[in-house]
Amino acid sequence: MVARLLLARHGQTEWHAENRYAGSSDVALTEEGLRQADELAGFAAAAGPSAVFCSPQSRARRTAEPSAKALDLPLRVVDELREVHFGLMEGRTRAELAEADPDAVARFLADPVSGAFPGSEPPADAAARGAGALRGIAADVPGETVLVVAHNTLIRLTLCALLGIPLENYRTVFPRLDNAAVTEIEIDGTRTGLLRLNQPARTRYWVT
């Protein structure tokens, strides 16, 4: 039975506002990020998902909390939805790393999988855990619609894994996911369909 998953990236954080890679680091939402969380809650209230899941990281939890509250639902934390650990890149901008290690940046830009930043979680591992998490959620909620709040790179890698897209293409096929924007997928066993990508969480975009 098909489950519909509404995948939302967390709201803006202090580091993302500065184009810093946050990864596994815990970084607070900005005022704009808090506003985006409230906007997502407005979307959730209109969409009416039956459950709200999120990553254990504070930026995802803080983004998901207003939606869970608006729906009077418990927030269900899934550890496997945490963001990719970026190793040497954590807390840095790409320009800063380019000064310290230009070869590392060049390898990443050429192939973000084989050229992943030194010390980072292997992208294939992140994609596998993300896909496993979403398939597990879908299996638990057959026929239902749920909201899942997670992270930019984790969601993009997971989409590639679920849709059969080569992982090394995740940055070109899915160049970005905006803060608090929603991507809609359907999962039925091992089959996944992409319905909408990176849509702003304003209810007028979701009238069907």
Where are each of the predicted segments found?
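Surface-exposed helix-capping loop/turn segments at secondary-structure junctions
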Residues: A46-S50, A139-L147
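Short active-site segment of divalent metal-dependent hydrolases/proteases
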Residues: T13, L154-I155
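Generic beta-sheet signal
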Residues: L5, E144-N152
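Phosphate-handling substructures
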Residues: K69-A131, R196-N198, V207-T208
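Conserved histidine-centered catalytic loops in small-molecule metabolism enzymes
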Residues: G48-E80, A106, E184-T208
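Loop-to-helix element that buttresses phosphate recognition and phosphoryl-transfer chemistry
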Residues: L5, Q12-A70, A116-A131
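Acidic, low-complexity terminal tails and accessory targeting/binding regions
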Residues: M1-A3, V84-E96, A139, E144, ...
